[in-house]
């Protein structure tokens, strides 16, 4: 279903019932309002903030909408009389133009009473609902079956930053869209496929690299050493898997004595001649596990164009009231308006993997609603067992990729997307 197939259902005045998740309201406004049309945001005491936020966002959309009119119901979301009285003056003020009511966001009682209030005065109103399971805009009719319009990715592409903005969340900093040292990340993914090489990597990382570069506190690893102490370090590569050593060499990180030179890390540059790592400790963090996040980003980028993925990124840090750290999506992309969130960890520890997946699931549902999909990329040997243990979650909405999936991860992510499409049929 392309955008032109929505045209016959577009209106000049669209009443939207605002829910706790304003994303469906935003989608409905973008798909069903004519250029220069007017949104009417019908909200309760509990959804006042999302309504006011959506009013601001819609005013800045490229289709030149008129400023959204706010229609407060206060605490009367299930009171037929008050809903009718709130909507009636708005309807009476409309002299020209087609009218629509989209009741995706409201409670069932709100939807019923709003429908009756509008239908009694304007029976030719376009009544609609966004079905989150099937990704369809449904047009309800009194004289026939519901018309279903598939909201394909190319019909409406929602930026990740816009998705956060719709929920009143401002990113702490710009998210990453270019993978750091993707070839090194690929080499490490190859290493993790082999159990012996994985052990070899961890032996080198903990017993050689961390011993040189990291502080210890109560016999446990603490923060990285200071820049002045890290810069002069040359670290033995004797026990390192050859694939990783080759990538260090390709990036000119090996000194004449054949050791890893942390001084050379500062010379790494992007295509734009910007430093790959702001500080040496950022390279240390990369080896500590961030490499897998960058590997995931590269795999998403590899399949983006042919899968209608326009917006993707890494490290979405969001401040959250009442918390010190807020929350973070490791990786995410939107396909149309559907959010795909990916939690990433190099751990194989079952409980930690489950915790990361559960946290990502909750945040993704909060951001992307029922349409959101969530995956965990980790180093477990048993991804299917791990997924089965997450019985509380809707298994159609989650995926778990283990270490055997890493080498073919772009293909696995593509299959995940296709499965999401299949589930929406």
Question: What are the language-model segments listed below?
Answer:
Residues 1-98, 112-327, 335-339, 347-350, ...:
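Long, low-complexity, Lys/Arg-enriched
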Residues 98-104:
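Short glycine-rich phosphate-binding loop at a beta-alpha junction
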Residues 105-110:
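Trp/Phe/Arg-rich N-terminal binding region typifying the photolyase-homology
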Residues 342:
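Conserved beta3 VAIK motif of the Hanks protein kinase fold
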């Amino acid at each position: 279903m392309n955008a032109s197939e929505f045209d016959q259902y577009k209106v000049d005045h669209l009443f939207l019932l605002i829910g706790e998740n304003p994303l469906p309201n935003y989608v409905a406004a973008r798909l069903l309002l004519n250029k220069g049309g007017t949104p009417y945001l019908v909200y309760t005491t509990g959804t006042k903030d999302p309504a006011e936020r959506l009013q601001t966002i819609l005013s800045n959309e490229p289709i030149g909408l008129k400023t959204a009119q706010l229609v407060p119901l206060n605490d009367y979301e299930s009171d037929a009389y008050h809903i009718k009285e709130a909507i009636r003056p708005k309807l009476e003020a409309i002299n020209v133009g087609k009218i629509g009511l989209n009741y995706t966001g409201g409670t069932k009682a709100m939807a019923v009473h709003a429908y009756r209030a509008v239908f009694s005065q304007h029976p030719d109103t376009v009544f609609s609902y966004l079905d989150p399971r099937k990704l369809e805009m449904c047009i309800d009719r009194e004289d026939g079956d519901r018309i279903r319009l598939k909201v394909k990715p190319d019909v409406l592409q929602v930026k990740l930053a816009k998705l956060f903005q719709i929920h009143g969340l401002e990113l702490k900093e710009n998210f990453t869209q270019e993978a750091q040292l993707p070839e090194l990340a690929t080499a490490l993914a190859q290493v993790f496929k082999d159990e012996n090489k994985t052990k070899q990597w961890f032996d080198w990382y903990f017993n050689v690299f961390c011993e040189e570069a990291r502080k210890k506190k109560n016999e446990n690893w603490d923060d990285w050493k200071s820049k002045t102490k890290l810069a002069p370090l040359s670290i033995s590569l004797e026990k390192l898997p050859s694939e990783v050593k080759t990538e260090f060499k390709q990036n000119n990180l090996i000194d004449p004595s054949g050791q890893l030179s942390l001084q050379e890390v500062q010379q790494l540059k992007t295509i734009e001649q910007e430093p790959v790592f702001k500080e040496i400790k950022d390279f240390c963090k990369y080896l500590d596990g961030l490499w897998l996040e960058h590997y995931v980003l590269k795999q998403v980028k590899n399949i983006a164009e042919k899968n209608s993925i326009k917006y993707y990124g890494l490290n979405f840090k969001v401040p959250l009231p009442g918390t010190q750290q807020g929350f973070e999506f490791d990786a995410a992309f939107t396909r149309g308006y559907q959010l795909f969130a990916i939690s990433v960890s190099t751990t194989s520890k079952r409980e930690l993997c489950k915790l990361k997946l559960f946290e990502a699931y909750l945040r993704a549902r909060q951001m992307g609603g029922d349409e959101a999909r969530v995956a965990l990329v980790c180093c477990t040997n048993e991804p299917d067992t791990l997924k089965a243990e997450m019985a509380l979650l809707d298994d159609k909405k989650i995926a778990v990729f283990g270490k055997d999936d890493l080498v073919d991860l772009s293909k696995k992510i593509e299959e995940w997307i296709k499965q999401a499409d299949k589930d929406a049929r």
